[in-house]
């Protein structure tokens, strides 16, 4: 790994471990690498993320490149999105204009629609999992397929996964649900946040109270503040997305025909739809599924921490202490 890639900086951290920006010494290409500690952290979610992600080739989805092993970690190498998270853009701007929100929403729906066409539902769509490529006219890049499920490979989802603010009512029931329909709800939350600058089902006075958020999700209690100017077409679309009964919720194909969605639709999206999503620019995955599965199995064996990169160990130690603080905060919320 170290012979092939030169580490440049940390990009972020989460429950999984650390993500770093690295340079491919051969091609000079910048790529992102997600490091997951070998051993018990290499579970079904990690395997699912890698296998599902490998099969996806679409301009609005972060490209999977390969998996490697280090003495201590499983490393997932993927396309680098230089523009960062869409979430950060909203934090900076406060909220987007309706036209800006539509521009990003159109790309999000294009990427999600492609996943669904391959029978893959994401199950954790949110602004933090929506990156930008850094170009002057930013291209959305969906990432993080750790909770994704493939109808071809896995059973119907019934576990409660995802981020509280984005979870659909049926996901909270702990019964089987259609992951594609739940993804539509999460796309609606993303659209609302872009337009309003806050979450639709959080109590503004008590945003960290997850119980209150869940109660409002189940009751579909949301409103658009008076100070936010949103067209009637857009309001109608949101009201068709935020429907508690999943069988009555608008579907992705219906969203793609909606008047509001079709306005100023970028030519590349409409042309891609006609071409049935074939991303001709994308090279096919170089690693065979069999090789990936072999690497994953090997990664389930704990690594030799004595051989670890000291900088990576320091980042992981810092992450652990942050996680402990966050867990304490969440405990206080209940």
Curated annotation (Swiss-Prot):
Processing after translation: Autophosphorylated in presence of Ca(2+).
Swiss-Prot/TrEMBL keywords: Abscisic acid signaling pathway, ATP-binding, Cytoplasm, Kinase, Nucleotide-binding, Nucleus, Phosphoprotein, Serine/threonine-protein kinase, Transferase
Induction section of the entry: By abscisic acid (ABA) in leaf blades and leaf sheaths. Induced during incompatible interaction with the bacterial pathogen Xanthomonas oryzae pv. oryzicola.
Signal peptide residue numbers: none
Keyword Nucleotide-binding listed: yes
Binding positions (ATP): 11-19, 34
Limits of the Protein kinase domain: 5-261
Main function: May play a role in signal transduction of hyperosmotic response.
Name recorded for this polypeptide: Serine/threonine-protein kinase SAPK3
Originating gene: SAPK3
């Amino acid at each position: 790994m170290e012979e092939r890639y030169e580490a440049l900086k940390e990009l972020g951290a989460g429950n999984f471990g650390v993500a770093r920006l690295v340079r491919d010494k051969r091609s000079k290409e910048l790529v992102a690498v997600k490091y997951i500690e070998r051993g018990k952290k290499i579970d079904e979610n990690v395997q699912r993320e890698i296998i599902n992600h490998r099969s996806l080739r679409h301009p609005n989805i972060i490209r999977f490149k390969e998996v490697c092993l280090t003495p201590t970690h499983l490393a997932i190498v993927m396309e680098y999105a230089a523009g960062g998270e869409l979430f950060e853009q909203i934090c900076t701007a406060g909220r987007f204009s309706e036209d800006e929100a539509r521009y990003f929403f159109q790309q999000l729906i294009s990427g999600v629609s492609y996943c669904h066409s391959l029978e893959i539902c994401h199950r954790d769509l949110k602004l933090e999992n929506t990156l930008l490529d850094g170009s002057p006219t930013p291209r959305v890049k969906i990432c993080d397929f750790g909770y994704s499920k493939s109808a071809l490979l896995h059973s119907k989802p019934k576990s409660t996964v995802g981020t509280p603010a984005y979870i659909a009512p049926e996901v909270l029931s702990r019964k089987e649900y259609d992951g594609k329909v739940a993804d539509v709800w999460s796309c609606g939350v993303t659209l609302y946040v872009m337009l309003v600058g806050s979450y639709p089902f959080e109590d503004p006075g008590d945003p960290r109270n997850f119980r209150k958020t869940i109660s409002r999700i189940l009751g579909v209690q949301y409103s658009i503040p008076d100070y936010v100017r949103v067209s009637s077409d857009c309001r109608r679309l949101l009201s068709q997305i935020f429907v508690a009964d999943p069988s009555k919720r608008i579907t992705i194909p219906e969203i793609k025909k909606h008047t509001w969605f079709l306005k100023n639709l970028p030519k590349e999206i409409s042309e891609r739809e006609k071409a049935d999503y074939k991303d001709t620019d994308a090279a096919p995955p170089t690693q065979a599924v069999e090789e990936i599965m072999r690497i994953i199995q090997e990664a389930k064996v704990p690594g030799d921490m004595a051989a670890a990169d000291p900088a990576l160990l320091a980042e992981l130690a810092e992450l652990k202490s942050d996680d402990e603080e966050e867990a304490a905060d969440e405990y206080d919320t209940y």
